[in-house]
Amino acid sequence: MRNVSRILPLLPGIAMLSGCNNAAQKSNGQNDQKPNIIYIFADDLGIGDLSCYGATKVSTPNIDRLAGQGVQFTNAYATSATSTPSRFGLLTGMYPWRQKNTGIAPGNSELIIDTACVTMADMLKDAGYATGAVGKWHLGLGPKGGTDFNKQITPNAQSIGFDYEFIIPATVDRVPCVFVENGRVVGLDPNDPITVNYEHKVGDWPTGEENPELVTLKPSQGHNNTIINGIPRIGWMTGGKSALWKDEDIADIITHKAKK
């Protein structure tokens, strides 16, 4: 088993290319740099999905290289088997099942982490790191009562220790299908405001349930609400056309932002 050199990958399993990407900073005016720390938190990732753990039907050379240069674990546990609570546990160090409102969050949920809570990002900032969250967020945004995507959104990731955020508010299969950068929806036209609802349909955009002939991906397991880019999502939305992402570009955009 090797010692960690520059990067420590953490791969518990739940859906994103995101986490905390902390640029090394010089401390106290000295020339020595702190090691970079990158958390990669992925949904639906099993031990058999990585070639460094024996997968034969897929090749994961970049992850394999990280494993080869760092520490590779063969026994690990997650605080939850689902998205929102596992992220909550990672950032706060608390068991999500002992906290309220830590179930799978809708895309218009309020921020579920108390801004008074000391998070992993706070601790890294105190240690002299610049911190960033890039990719899937799924911990809610905004105050109690839900998120208004048409103005500066606060509290957000920057309210709990991150210097920078470029995030998907919930998941790629949930509305709103937009990116949020430092509390603002990227590319939003103020004359075309976003409305999001998880209880009933809003607006007149077609849905997978009502218009199955318009979908390129067959709806299933609740993924039959508003259609975005031919894909029926969970939840309903209308507005914000100029801000909608293109699904085929998500990985490239997220990777570009993470590198920055």
Feature locations, PLM:
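Formylglycine-dependent sulfatase
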Residues: R2-S5, P12-A15, C20-K260
